[in-house]
Design a protein with these regions (language model features):
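Membrane-integrated ABC transporters
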Residues: 1-39, 54-65, 83-91, 98, ...
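Transmembrane helices of ABC transporter permease
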Residues: 20, 24-34, 68-72, 139-192, ...
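Transmembrane helix-loop-helix hairpins at lipid-water interfaces of multipass membrane proteins
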Residues: 25-82, 86, 159-164, 273-279
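Hydrophobic alpha-helical segments in the permease module
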Residues: 69-76, 80, 173-175, 246-260, ...
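Loop segments that connect adjacent transmembrane helices in multi-pass transporters
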Residues: 117-120, 193-241, 331-333
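Cytosolic ends of transmembrane helices, especially the final helix of ABC transmembrane type-1 domains
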Residues: 197, 217-220, 244, 291-319
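ABC-type nucleotide-binding domain
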Residues: 335-585
Length: 585
């Protein structure tokens, strides 16, 4: 019962995508009925000519009927053209709408969703799955209507022409229908597995190509190729199984077609010998049998398309049914003109069963610069992720300017927080696009000002097309320091009330860090700043330092105050100094 209800909901969701194109869909439906009706007319005219016009040798009437049939064929051709054209346009529009909805839905998910779903799998659902669905949205109503009308029409006419042959054909059709239902069930399961395996292949390929520099650095090309081929072999095994079912189905339809023709020929011959049917009726009957077989063969192709398309839609629907973990409140307010005070109240957070933060509380005044230090994995970056509402805490509250961040709408909240990370993500586009990303109608003066403030203009001016220079995938044409300065320029232009620096200089050499540090000083001036770092030069400038340990804040104070405590911070500081001395040596 639950499965039937789910199928009903899925079908309803599928049909909703026809709403914006109901005029086109109506034209396809009416046009398909007309095409099917025109297909049914030809044998009727043949029977009439054989029964009436030929015995009377009325050549003029025969020519008139031929001319009339020619006009009908031309009309049929024109109808088929417009049905095909408008139907395919409708299908790509529906495919676009589904892709837009799926992409927006995926974008609305919290980071937890992306932690549990591979990018390649999601890409497969956005591309291959939806392409299969798009074709089905047109071929579905078109093929089904034409095939059903022609098949039901031919069966009805065959019953009218000769009840004996009609009953025999109907019995054969019932047997074939039962056989088709059984095969369809197997095909559906096979194509569902096929789409899943294709997604795994896409995920593996995407992972290997994204990390191609690491792959080459470790000379692991053969390893990655073998892993991809393993996934490919698994996909091929599933596809081979589906091809067996499809091959069996196609060949069985072909056998049924030939057997039916043979059966009608033998049965018709016996009926003619027994004077139960006229020769002209028998010829018309044979024409209708062949006309009946055309949609049957067409349905064979459609069945494969239907199973592929619905398997793709099932995967689409599966994602669309996942509710975003973090949603805006109905009465959410816009976050704007913030002062920048931050308060964490008894915040607890876990990644699955791994508790990272345990009842953490602290206050940060507006305009204050605070650093968070601690061993790797103690939850420093998690604090930033929670502040930006990338994740929802298990318990506790986070406030900005005394208002719980759950009361702000997410877009405006994030627009007021600037994030600079160690791993800078840049788009495969121009310098201009990457600096102005997320902002609309930015004047060139403002963009250049932000670049200068981030000390980025000195290298941008040397680029071939300056701000319009393409920087390659993830900014590969730029150095690490240059990418970092673009990221800082992006945040300066954003002009947020709160800035989060997440290991922003940890991967840079000392000379580059000096340039970046100057840019960061301009960025953080008179803004609330959260620093997550190991570099002493960055930490020392903080008004306060929080030391995280075992999911809690174990120490708090200025750099000098924490050194006097001779606790965890002091030991980490000494260790860092010893390492630096060793490196200098």
């Amino acid at each position: 019962m639950e499965t039937k209800l789910m199928k009903g909901k899925m079908l309803f969701a599928f049909l909703q995508y026809y709403k914006p194109y109901k005029k086109t869909a109506a034209f396809i439906v009416v046009g398909s009925f007309a095409v099917a009706f025109l297909d049914l007319i030809f044998p009727v005219f043949v029977r009439h000519i054989l029964n009436v016009e030929l015995p009377q040798q009325n050549l003029q009437s025969i020519l008139l009927y031929a001319l009339f049939l020619l006009m009908l064929y031309i009309l049929n051709t024109v109808l088929l053209y417009w049905i095909s054209y408008s139907g395919h346009v409708m299908s790509i529009n529906i495919e676009r709408d589904m892709r837009r909805d799926l992409f927006r839905h995926i974008e609305s998910m919290s980071f937890k969703f992306f932690d549990n779903n591979r990018t390649g799998q999601l890409l497969a659902r956005l591309t291959g799955d939806l392409t299969e669905i798009g074709e089905l949205t047109f071929r579905g109503p078109n093929d089904v209507i034409i095939c059903l009308v022609v098949m039901l029409g031919t069966i009805s006419i065959m019953f009218w022409m000769n009840i004996y042959l009609g009953v025999l054909i109907a019995l054969l059709l019932i047997l074939k229908t039962v056989h088709t239902v059984i095969i369809n069930h197997k095909m559906k399961a096979a194509f569902r597995k096929n789409r899943a395996k294709n997604g795994e292949v896409s995920a593996k390929a995407e992972e290997a190509l994204s990390g191609i520099r690491l792959v080459k650095a470790f000379a692991a090309e053969e390893l990655e190729c073998s892993l991809l081929m393993k996934k490919n072999e698994e996909s091929m095994a599933v596809r081979k199984a589906s091809f067996k079912i499809l091959g069996y189905f196609s060949s069985s339809v072909n056998f049924f077609t030939n057997f039916t023709n043979l059966f009608v020929l033998v049965a018709g011959g016996l009926l003619i010998a027994a004077n139960k049917i006229q020769l002209s009726d028998f010829i018309a009957f044979l024409l209708y049998v062949n006309l009946f077989m055309k949609p049957l063969l067409r349905l064979t192709v459609f069945t494969e398309m239907y199973q592929r398309g619905m398997a793709g839609f099932a995967r689409f629907y599966e994602i669309m049914q996942i509710k975003p973990e973090i949603i805006d409140a109905k009465d959410a307010i816009e976050c704007k003109n913030i002062n920048g005070s931050i308060c964490f109240k008894n915040v607890t957070f876990s990644y699955g069963n791994n508790k990272v933060l345990n009842n953490v509380s602290f206050n940060i005044s507006a305009g204050e610069t605070v650093a968070f230090v601690g061993e790797t994995g103690v939850g420093k970056t998690t604090l930033a992720n929670l502040l930006l509402r990338f994740y929802e805490p298990d318990s506790g509250d986070i406030l900005i300017d005394g208002i719980n961040i759950k009361k702000y709408d997410q877009r405006s909240l994030r627009k007021n927080i600037g994030l600079v990370q160690q791993e800078v993500f840049l788009f495969s586009d121009s310098v201009r696009h990457n600096i102005t990303y997320g902002l609309s109608e930015v004047r060139d003066e403002k963009m250049v000002f932000a670049a200068r403030a981030a000390s980025a203009d000195e290298f941008i001016e040397k680029l071939p097309q300056k701000y319009d220079t393409e920087i390659g995938e993830r900014g590969i044409k730029l150095s690490g320091g240059q990418r970092q300065r673009l990221a800082i320029a992006r945040v300066i232009l954003k002009n947020p009330g709160i800035v989060v620096l997440d290991e922003a200089t940890s991967a840079l050499d000392n000379k580059t860090e000096e340039k970046i540090q100057k840019a960061l000083d301009k960025l953080t001036r008179e803004r609330t700043t959260l620093i997550i770092a190991h570099r002493l030069s960055t930490i020392k400038k903080a008004n306060r330092i929080f030391v995280l340990n075992n999911g809690r804040i174990s120490e708090e104070g200025t750099h000098e105050e924490l050194l006097k405590l001779k606790g965890l911070y002091y030991r980490q500081y000494k260790t860092t100094l010893d390492k630096n001395k060793l490196l200098d040596t």
